[in-house]
Amino acid sequence: MFPLDNSRRFLWLLVLLFGCFLPCLADLKVLVRLEDGQLTEENLQADSDKDFITLEFRKTDGTFVTYLADFKQDVKIFHVLILGELERGQSQFQALCFVTRLQSNEIIPSESMAKLRQKNPHAVRQAEEMRGTDTLQMDVAINFTKGVQLTPHIHNICAEAKEAIYTRQEDVRLWLERGIDGSMFEVLPQPSSIPSLHPCKLCPQDWKPCICSYHLSLEWIPCSLKYCKNRDSSVKTTSYRCGIRSCQKAFTFHFYVAQKQLCLWDEET
């Protein structure tokens, strides 16, 4: 038997040892105000071992949004699960996946995210920096089975959107240079090649192909680290991490659909 003091030291040593080998996980809940003025809760999770971050929230109309940043592959995924309009012949829900490159300044590293701790979850958070809206032409379809080459998370995040996974030609060119198999990509019809292809909101027939648009906004994301300056006794100035900076970022995706029936929400925009 260990003496009491030795037992405590032994248990503390085990905690330290296991803490070195187990992945560092974080789960934060942030209350934010959506573009329509309603409140929702963002759930942010980070896995520093697998090096990715997810952000999830539900919009006022019931749409469920998942954003995933894969730092190992420099890829981000937007998954949108939209409730269908049953009275107009749609299925119970419709899933979309948008896959594109992850830029270096979009969100803090997973290791930094995993170190954040929950503070005052009932306070409504407002982003410190407004980064505007990116308009993305998602003119290429991704084969679900082969998409794992881009990021293994596609099979988990986009399982409900196997026939609706989109990316951009400019991203495809970069991935091809990196040796990604080009057979997973299919260039979709565009108005430049088919003049009769119009935006879905201008298309009068539900069965005609058109260019659909979908807008979403991430109201609060930890986009960068804050650094403070410290001056020591030798009057030497050093910098150290002292917090995070939050940002708001919106996206508008334009993509081809085989019939307007798959883009009924565009009538309301």
Swiss-Prot record:
Residues in the signal sequence: 1-26
**What domain of life?**
Eukaryota
InterPro entries the record matches: Oaf (IPR026315), Oaf_C (IPR053897), OAF_N (IPR053894)
Q: Name one Pfam family in it.
A: OAF_C
State the UniProt keywords alphabetically. Answer: Signal
The similarity annotation says:
Belongs to the OAF family.
Task: Return the protein name.
Answer: Out at first protein homolog
* Upper lineage: Eukaryota, Metazoa, Chordata, Craniata, Vertebrata
